[in-house]
Amino acid sequence: MTLPQAIRDKIFLMEEVINFPTSLLFHKNYHWENLAMVHYSNLSGAVESLMERGRKVAIATGFYVPAGNPPATETDGPPGALILTEGLKYLGMEVSLLSDEYTLSTLKAGLKILNLSERDVPLIIFPLEHSDVDHSSRTVNEEVESPLSIRFVQEFMNGPLGRDLSHLIFIERVGPNHTLESFLAQEVPGNSSLKDFEIILPPLLRNRCFSSRLEDITRFTAKTHFLLEFGKKWNPSFESIGMGDRGNEIGSGKIPWRVFKDHGTSNREPVFCCRLKTDYFISCGISNWGGYALMAGVALAKGRLDVLEKITPEQEGMVLNHLIHHGPSIDGITLKQDYSVDGIEFNDYMRVIERLKEIAFE
């Protein structure tokens, strides 16, 4: 099914808003890090996919910051996952939330403030792989070294929550950076950037999960990317959507490594950029905005704008505040329990969300 042009135009405008939001904001000195990714963003494709095939959806999120005060998951990711969870469920889809133990309390707090039980929305906890304590475990055959993760993927895909899964959505979920194999799979034959890759990413830095500060958080990160790499062995029909704002999130593998090397805003992007690609990728200045845009697009396409009526500054502020204090969650930039997301104070953060809603209702 192809969306009517009028709806496609609105979705294009939403995508523009979440990638180039500066004109909407009171403070103009924010620094956006997603510009290299915008060309690869496909919000309309993600909307069409959910519109046509959305039945049973699993949403993965959680970006843990061990250097935070306190150490906690970011405020970017869970709010976007929760708005999608609530909205898609309202539209009649089965929805589950998936993360690891470091984000569990935040997601539980989110469901509680939304008056949703774990019977309404199952919480799936992907186990941490003990081998990741050994730094060298990622430089050998990772599948062999990760029996716990492989078994979990198999059991999930064959179980009641994964069987007949139509969509797997990743929102601000950190994923591993490149390996030599993933780099070569992206490269055009004869390209001379192999030497650059080997200099920038020596073997012991490959297949690791990094924050944008180049903090190695591999041992704090369950291998949720295995759902993409190996999940189709047991469920070949699901489609995947990824959302990110820096390039170290699952889904960003849609963007070639050399793009991050040549057009990144710092020399850190080619180190931390994730190799995992999804069927559809949504670039955004803040990943939560991608979740709101996807929800607004699906509501618009289905003619169900009533789904968006609950989205107000008061409601979203209440949810964010609850996550901060009861998750807990922290701002990934300030590293504190601030009433902000990625360094963007709440009023400015909310202006983008309100604009998405305005576009849908225009």
Over which residues does each language-model region extend?
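An acidic, phosphate/nucleotide-engaging active-site surface
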Residues: A109-G231
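Structural motif
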Residues: K56-A58, S166-H167, E239
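C-terminal functional extensions of proteins
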Residues: G242-E362
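Short glycine-rich anion-binding loops that position phosphate/pyrophosphate groups of nucleotides
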Residues: G62-V65, R173-P176, R246
